[in-house]
């Protein structure tokens, strides 16, 4: 199965990732920036309380997997995330579930 997640779902994944790391509620996390650079990849900056956290591509992808596992009962062992950016369409994530890599 393949899914395409929109930018809000990516943000939700970032919030879940940080909430799991910091033992807070996802609602307490605010994503301030989501960006893409050809050289460095994807980047997110979030705040919670007075704290700041920066995430790179791998952490963002892991957050999406955690979000799908916790809120939609996906099996993280068979879920693969590919972050995408298009100048016209913005941010998205292509999610492969239970598909053998070719």
Curated annotation (Swiss-Prot):
It comes from Bacillus subtilis (strain 168). This is Uncharacterized protein YxcD. It comes from the Bacteria.
